[in-house]
Amino acid sequence: MPYVDRQNRICGFLDIEENENSGKFLRRYFILDTREDSFVWYMDNPQNLPSGSSRVGAIKLTYISKVSDATKLRPKAEFCFVMNAGMRKYFLQANDQQDLVEWVNVLNKAIKITVPKQSDSQPASDSLSRQGDCGKKQVSYRTDIVGGVPIITPTQKEEVNECGESLDRNNLKRSQSHLPYFAPKPPSDSAVIKAGYCVKQGAVMKNWKRRYFQLDENTIGYFKSELEKEPLRVIPLKEVHKVQECKQSDIMMRDNLFEIVTTSRTFYVQADSPEEMHSWIKAVSGAIVAQRGPGRSSSSMRQARRLSNPCIQRSIPAGLQNPNSLSVLPGPQPPPHIPQPLAATLWSQAVPWRSEEFTNLLPRSSQGTSRSRLSLQESQLPK
């Protein structure tokens, strides 16, 4: 999806047919700059390229007459649109239908409000500048602010950019991965939830490199490319505390930056668009919840069972659980070791206990007690 960067330019990834009528679309990073009256594209986001990397191509907005849908002109190319620029038509391919509509709208709006300027030999100068840069050495640098003073130090050894060979190698990689966001990976034990390219900050040199990320049910790992089988690192989801949009993106001067906070380290990852950033945050957070959710629910169910079935209820006899059963308890039975006829005779001759015959044995008030003693003495006197 196209998005607006910090310099108020519209940026995003598209696939372009650089060689006319070749039918081969290569993935490039496009920048629409209305202030510079240009629509340029690079091999990748310039923030991720070595210092001094030149652009791959450029078109003046004044040269573009119309931008329209080209699905009928190129039926085999999905989500394709065309730019009419002078004597040539540039065919580009978006990620989806919404991406196509947004790019067509922003480009048509840009060419309408552009004021024509005097033409210059921009394409020729671009080709000359690219030829002049072929033999130069490209070095990536790291900028640190120490005491308010910027200090620039090289991050790696100088590499000679052998123009034709290096570009062909990059083009070969891009053509092999037509849509790197959805490039398939070899099947693994866990189902892949989300996969795609992002830019990650290194742990030691703090440099930014493009890596292929893959999220499954238990881990999130990153590879050097989508063709690699072994990941560079695997982060277990149980070690991830939170995933959120980075609050230091202004300090790092990075768009679409989010962070993965773990026990030992915070990983800073840059997506290609705001939509892709939010998609990654949502996917990783959902995987964490899905992994930790069943544990909480099972423990809560066990606790609920313990509260609903206390141990004291299990020791109560079944007959006493019903209060109505107390009124129908069986009467006294003879001992089992006595024969039945003899037991019946003994029980028939036994004096039955009646509660009213023992009421005189209960303690009474002092007056009642003294009166009963006098009555007893009076009864013993001779008459």
Swiss-Prot record:
Task: List this protein's GO terms for biological process.
Answer: androgen metabolic process; B cell receptor signaling pathway; cellular response to hydrogen peroxide; establishment of protein localization; estrogen metabolic process; face morphogenesis; female gonad development; Leydig cell differentiation
Spell out the residue ranges making up region: Disordered: 362-383
Q: Where is the composition biased (Low complexity)?
A: 370-383
What superkingdom does the record give? Eukaryota
Q: What is known of its domains?
A: Binds to membranes enriched in PtdIns3,4P2 via the C-terminal PH domain.
Q: Where is the PH domain?
A: 7-112, 191-289
Please name the Pfam families in this protein's record. Answer: PH
> Gene that codes for this?
Plekha1
| InterPro entries per UniProt | PH-like_dom_sf, PH_domain, PI-Interact_SigTrans_Reg
The name on file for this protein is Pleckstrin homology domain-containing family A member 1
A GO cellular component annotation in the UniProt record: nucleoplasm
Topology of the protein relative to the lipid bilayer: Peripheral membrane protein
Function per UniProt: Binds specifically to phosphatidylinositol 3,4-diphosphate (PtdIns3,4P2), but not to other phosphoinositides. May recruit other proteins to the plasma membrane.
Report keywords, A-Z: Cell membrane, Cytoplasm, Lipid-binding, Membrane, Nucleus, Phosphoprotein, Repeat
UniProt-annotated location(s): Cytoplasm; Cell membrane; Nucleus
Q: How does it assemble?
A: Interacts with MPDZ and PTPN13.
Q: Which GO terms describe its molecular function?
A: lipid binding; PDZ domain binding; phosphatidylinositol-3,4-bisphosphate binding
Spell out the Gene3D superfamilies in the cross-references: Pleckstrin-homology domain (PH domain)/Phosphotyrosine-binding domain (PTB)
